[in-house]
Amino acid sequence: IYHDPEFEALCLDWAKWLMECIPRTREGGFQHVTSANGDRQGVRLNESEMWIDTLFMTVLFLNRMGQKYGKQEWIDESIKQVLMHIKYLYDTHTGLFFHGWSFNRMDNFGGVFWCRGNSWFTLGILDYLDMFKGTLNQGVKTFILDTYKAQVRALRDLQGEDGLWHTVLDDSTSYEETSGSAAITAGILKGIRMGILDDSYLPCAKKAIRAILKNIDTDGTVLKVSGGTGMGYDRDHYKNILIAPM
C-alpha cells in the first residue's frame, strides 16, 4: 500500500465503507456498484446482483487492508465474500465462472462465461491467498485452490489456436480478447511458480505470451481489448462489446 497520508486516509475510508455501507445482497454478498449507464458521475447499485468483478476490484483490497492494519473482521469479511462468490458464480459442470448472479432473478443472467471476468479469478485469487502468508485456514485454502485448479484445467482446453482466449470462452465465433488472456496467462504462470500447477501448463502459457506480444503495438497500445462490459443477458451482449485498444 502506497505510504502517503492522504491516500492512506482514503484507503481506510474505503475499507470502512465496504464494511459498513456497501449495499448487500441476500446472505450479505457485496453488490457490484457501478457508474450509471451513460453517466460516469452517476451510480448504479445493481440491486441484489453479485459480479465476478467484485472479487478483483474490492475483496482483494479489503483483505490487504485487513492484513496491513490487523483488522481480523476485515479479513474474515473478505473470506466470506470469496466463498460466497464461488458459491453463486462457479459452474461445477464446466469449471468456469459466470459473470454474475441475481437474487431477484435467481439465475446467472445469460449464463455466459466471460473471458475477462474469469481472468480476474485466475490471477486475483492467487494474489489473495499470497496475502495470508500461510495463515489462512487450511480447509478454506484447499477449497479455493481446488476451484482455481479446476478453472485452469478448463481454460487450457478452451485456449484458441493462436494462443488467446475468446471473449465468450466457450464460443469460438466470439472475438479473441487480449486483456483477459493476459490475466489468465499471468495466473497460470503464478500458479506454476507457486508450485500449485505443474510444468505441463507451461506450453499453454508460452503460447499465450507469444499471442499477447503480437497484439502490443510499437507504441505500447494493447490491441483486441474489449471495452467496459456491464452484465449481459445473452452471449451477443459480450460478442458486441466494442473493441477499445488501450
Regions found by a protein language model. Name each.
Residues 1, 5-11, 21-31, 171, ...:
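CBM-like carbohydrate-recognition segments
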Residues 91-95, 131-139, 159-165, 194-199:
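Surface-exposed helix-capping loop/turn segments at secondary-structure junctions
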